[in-house]
Amino acid sequence: MIKLNKIKRNCVAAVILTMCLMTAGCARNSTSTTTASGGETTITSGIAKDDTDVTHADDAENYRVAITGDFTVTSDTSDGVTQSGSVYTITKAGEYTVTGLLSEGQLIVDAGDEDEVTIILNGTSITCSSGSPIYVKNASEVKIKSEENTFNEVIDNRTEATEDSSDDAGNAAIYATCDLKLVGKGSLVVTGNYNNGIQSKDDLSIKNVIVKVTAVNNAVKGNDAVDIESGNIIAISAKGDGIKTSNSSLSNKDNQKGIVTITGGNIDVYAACDGIDAAYGVDISGDGNLNIYTDTYSEYSEEVTSSGSSPSTSTGRDSSANKTASANTVSYVAASDTITNAPGGFGGGNMGGGNAPDMSNGNAPDMSNGNAPDMNGSSGGNKTGGDRPGMPGDFNESGNSSGQSYSTKGIKAESEINISGFTINICSTDDGIHANSDSGVLETGEDGKGTIVINSGSITISSGDDGMHADKQLDVNDGYINIVTSYEGLEAMTINLNGGKIYVYATDDGINACTGDGKTSPIVNVTGGYIDVTTASGDTDGIDSNGNYVQTGGFVLVKGGSSSGNVSGSIDVDGTVTITGGT
């Protein structure tokens, strides 16, 4: 029986918005300009980036050529290949070069337990309607190399799998029961009409290759691990996840399984469900570009079967949303306005006048000398209006009512997420980045850690729910974070903001330290960095802690409030506010 990974647990949050919803997405030119007697002021909901600034992966389709000629498998290993009709079987360790057109056939590896096999794709097309076109039944490790300056394709033409389908003939277009490595400087197009695109039951690694994977379910899956070192990868999932691991156990050497590791490359992920779904963790470091579009932000998404009380129920989907969205008008109060008789950030009083620092060039003010930027000065009158982008898909003014009973997050891990590099762009109808701490969720029987750590990198998120959500703890030590749109920008029980530049736009709370396990007292702790928070009209807070707020450094700017002249709490706490440094 086949397990369809597109079946998702119910993970829809019940959220109600009380204002006109903004976009969850990647709109071009979403900086708002308002005009009043005091002149023109630019209010930024984060620093919106033009989509033309996004670096996308090179598409393997750009190198497509017609594959002709007889199919051949050559090797210097004698008696290493057998042929039965259109099925070619590699039985020994060695290097095998594949060329030509194989229609309705298979390339199978069935070697010894200790054998390492290298398959060189040297201009080939393999199509099969009865099993995985490339099927590794047994070996120690298989390396598939796309030869430089060649175009290659693998097409699984089987009818889409069901719950009763067998995986005896392979569960993906390229399917391996052992470690699988994709390498080479050529191009490879993989189409998985049956279930997954590329899958290893152990570790899957990708280096250098230009690869485009389109699958009805998961595009790229390594049960134990996925490791992307370099290359250009486009992963498209019509009904599942883009990049996925599923095993969170420990290896025989006590190494943690279930981690997606990305250290280089240009990667585009289009997924109906999660962009990256890790059974344990996600580690991203180094230089590269990662773009993720989920649910209605992926033009490739189709109807998804959801689990819950009715596992067989199909959830209808609206047409996919364009990455650029239309704008709704939202009223708000500029940070530089003088508000009288309005509740202040700490439980009453006026919001002082002054001018917000100029950030029109997208740069935070210089605080290298330890001093906060000068905000003295007067402002004109109240400023309202301005365009805010509109929500995608089936979001509407009643709240986050997408109706999905499956997860559509950008990056999701059952335990921890660590980011130390990369330029990341996420457009998701669910949380942009999410770490779980569910009880006993790991195969070791342990709870997930529920932690997110940002050490460096540039992250831009447009989310229909939370920008970043950690069940336990969120640490930002450095880097650039731009939550262009969200319901709540940053959310965790413990939020430590130690450095970097952080821009947040939220329709509810910008930064929220929430209750959770009943053991940890929620806290927002600011020790450094530049934090710019904008919230929409209504009952919203720039910073909301269900426990305490502590600031010993950094610069915090909160903009938000109401078109009627009232502003919600800049900082709203259930505990205490302690400020001994910073601004």
Feature-to-residue mapping (PLM):
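A composition-driven surface/loop motif
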Residues: 2, 9-583
